[in-house]
Amino acid sequence: MTDAAVSFAKDFLAGGVAAAISKTAVAPIERVKLLLQVQHASKQITADKQYKGIIDCVVRIPKEQGVLSFWRGNLANVIRYFPTQALNFAFKDKYKQIFLGGVDKRTQFWLYFAGNLASGGAAGATSLCFVYPLDFARTRLAADVGKAGAEREFRGLGDCLVKIYKSDGIKGLYQGFNVSVQGIIIYRAAYFGIYDTAKGMLPDPKNTHIVISWMIAQTVTAVAGLTSYPFDTVRRRMMMQSGRKGTDIMYTGTLDCWRKIARDEGGKAFFKGAWSNVLRGMGGAFVLVLYDEIKKYT
């Protein structure tokens, strides 16, 4: 293998391992966030059964579905997240070579910053094309509030993918893809762009104390998450449309979804579960720091 291939493989492995560990740790928070986002568009959750907030959700889930249901959809998430995050990190460095080749970060700061934004956004969008059906399945599995057996909408990852494919074809597995690309570019641009720029401004980036790295990463993930959150809410709502027919369809398209959420639920609805997303972001910050630490030893 060439040095470039070895470097790419190390990026892929380091990013994937770090992501799988952190995602499993924050899976319960992830499920709470998803339920708060999509409950209004769920056929299983009637108006009188909707969760009132994070605490209500955390209390009711183990009572109604069992403690292990906090990790519902986590297997799909780990399977999805390993290639997603690994590809993001690997492609990010490849895109950095394209956008930042010959750019001096000290004398061309804004060009350097723009290059980091572009490389981060392009990496996220590229990865999404490959793993979107898994992201879709993870959302639908996490949104399934049936207790067991016949009450469940899907029996697992394979059952979810097969049922939606039979019902709606490949298009059903990519429901909400366009708004996802918009959101992922905004999120990844901030996630990678600001983080790399901030670290690049430090005197000795490679030997930065882990606490400083974590603080930078925590700020970046919180800002990036809140900025792109409305896009995430809309894409999750669109994912809930797959498998529906006739009058069961709530939104005719992405623009209709934006309009109806704003009209019927108000602007706050775009940020349902946002606080749990900030908590979940601690896992994202941990990924960035862990990735840098793993790379030091590879």
Swiss-Prot record:
This is ADP/ATP translocase 2. Residues 1-7, 100-109, 200-210, 292-298 are mitochondrial intermembrane. It is found in: Mitochondrion inner membrane; Membrane. Keywords: Acetylation, Antiport, Chromosome partition, Host-virus interaction, Membrane, Methylation, Mitochondrion, Mitochondrion inner membrane, Phosphoprotein, Repeat, Transmembrane, Transmembrane helix, Transport. It comes from Homo sapiens (Human). Belongs to the mitochondrial carrier (TC 2.A.29) family. Expressed in erythrocytes (at protein level). GO terms for molecular function: adenine nucleotide transmembrane transporter activity; adenine transmembrane transporter activity; ATP:ADP antiporter activity; oxidative phosphorylation uncoupler activity; proton transmembrane transporter activity; RNA binding; ubiquitin protein ligase binding. ADP binds at residues 80, 92, 235. One of its GO terms (cellular component) is mitochondrial nucleoid. ADP:ATP antiporter that mediates import of ADP into the mitochondrial matrix for ATP synthesis, and export of ATP out to fuel the cell. Cycles between the cytoplasmic-open state (c-state) and the matrix-open state (m-state): operates by the alternating access mechanism with a single substrate-binding site intermittently exposed to either the cytosolic (c-state) or matrix (m-state) side of the inner mitochondrial membrane. In addition to its ADP:ATP antiporter activity, also involved in mitochondrial uncoupling and mitochondrial permeability transition pore (mPTP) activity. The modification Phosphoserine is found at residue 7. Residues 38-74, 131-178, 232-273 are mitochondrial matrix. Residues 235-240 are annotated as: Important for transport activity.
